[in-house]
Structure formats: C-alpha cells, structure tokens
Amino acid sequence: MFRVLNDDVYSPAEIQQQNPLAFGKASSLFTDNRSANDQCETGENVRESGQDHVKRPMNAFIVWSRERRRKVALENPKMQNSEISKQLGYEWKRLTDAEKRPFFEEAQRLLAVHRDKYPGYKYRPRRKTKRQQKLLPADSSKLCKQMHIETLQPFTYRDGCANTTGSRMESQLSLSQSVTITNSFFQNEHHSSWTNLGHNRVTLATQISADFPFYQSLQPGLSCAYFQY
C-alpha cells in the first residue's frame, strides 16, 4: 500500500518532463508577475528607467517643516501624517515675516544651487494612472480585462432577470385575458342554456295542458301539475 502511494507522488522534474510547455508558460507568467510587483514596490518607471529622477528644489515651507515634522512625530508617535501636515500648515501661517525670512533665504540658496547643477531642468509631474498602466505586462493587462468583464457579469444577469420578468408579466397578462374571455364565453353559454331550459319548460307545460283534458278537472286548490320527465 505504501508503495502505491509513493508511486502516485510526482516530483517537479517529472511534471516538467511530462508537460514542458505548460510548465514553461506557468513559470514565465509567474516571473512576469513578480517583475511587475517589484516595479510597483520600488516605484520604477519604464519611461525613466535610464534617467535619474531629479527632485524639485525645496521651498521655504519645506525647509522649515523638515525639522519641525520630526519633532512633532517624536512628541506624538500615534499622530497620523495627515494630522501632522495640518498642524504644520497651521503653525506656518501663524509665523511672522521675520520668523519666515531665514527659511526663504535658505530656499533661495538651494534654488541657485539647483539651477547650477541642472541648468535645463523643467518640472514635469508624473501621471500616476498612466505610469501604473505602463508597469503592467501584457499577460497581467489581459488578466485585468478578464476581471473587468467578470465584474460586469452581474449587471448582465440583472438585465436578463429584467427581461425574463417582463416576459413573465406579458405571459401572465395574456393568460389573464384568455381566462377572462373564456369565463365570459362560459357565462354566455350558461345563460343561454338556462334560457333554453326555461323556454322548453313553458313549451312542455303548454303541450301538457293541450293534450290532457283532465287537467281542468283537478282539485280547486291546485294550480298546476308536476310530472316527472
């Protein structure tokens, strides 16, 4: 029994020998996904892979808030970054022009150094949406399209339900109309049958009174005679 179980267990090398094409496709897809994830984590851009990203020169507020942010973060370790930024903006507005002057001078000095180092620099903001789309390989883009189509299937299913509901309502309406017509037909037939039956009874009574002369010799309390027919 143990020998049979051991024979059923296949090693990765045997699987690769049996189906090398499928194994190669799976491995290539796995490596492509890993490379795409690595690019997303490191923030590398395909367009700027061969060029170093040049940062903008710091302004007076950035020069002041760089040290102040560290102090606030150390004093309030549980405070979020967004709250720290709000507090720094409020404090910067409360500073006077004399208190802001040294930071403006430092920002002017950094701007001059940046111009000397990068004479033809132009600020070009990155577009995050296009950058994320370019980072995706061909296989992952196809997978995203397939996932997008699968997410749209519930809406198609709802449309199908609406169509089936409409067809059911139309069938029920036609069925109710046919039932109404059938009921009216049976009512007319029933009324005509009762009318014919009453007419036949009157004709039968007239024939009986004409055919039997002893009808007049009945007792004075009786106005009619009943016969089984």
From Swiss-Prot:
SMART domains under this entry? HMG
What is the name of the gene encoding this protein? Answer: SRY
> A Pfam family in this protein?
HMG_box
Q: State the DNA-binding region(s).
A: 54-122
The protein's PTM annotation reads: Acetylation of Lys-130 contributes to its nuclear localization and enhances its interaction with KPNB1. Deacetylated by HDAC3.
Q: Which UniProt keywords apply?
A: Acetylation, Activator, Calmodulin-binding, Cytoplasm, Differentiation, DNA-binding, Nucleus, Repressor, Sexual differentiation, Transcription, Transcription regulation
- Cellular component annotations (GO), alphabetically ordered: cytoplasm; nuclear speck; nucleus
Task: Outline what the protein does.
Answer: Transcriptional regulator that controls a genetic switch in male development. It is necessary and sufficient for initiating male sex determination by directing the development of supporting cell precursors (pre-Sertoli cells) as Sertoli rather than granulosa cells. Involved in different aspects of gene regulation including promoter activation or repression. Binds to the DNA consensus sequence 5'-[AT]AACAA[AT]-3'. SRY HMG box recognizes DNA by partial intercalation in the minor groove and promotes DNA bending. Also involved in pre-mRNA splicing.
Q: What is the lineage of its organism?
A: Eukaryota, Metazoa, Chordata, Craniata, Vertebrata
Record-given protein name: Sex-determining region Y protein
* Subunit-structure text: Interacts with CALM, EP300, HDAC3, KPNB1, ZNF208 isoform KRAB-O, PARP1, SLC9A3R2 and WT1. The interaction with EP300 modulates its DNA-binding activity. The interaction with KPNB1 is sensitive to dissociation by Ran in the GTP-bound form. Interaction with PARP1 impaired its DNA-binding activity.
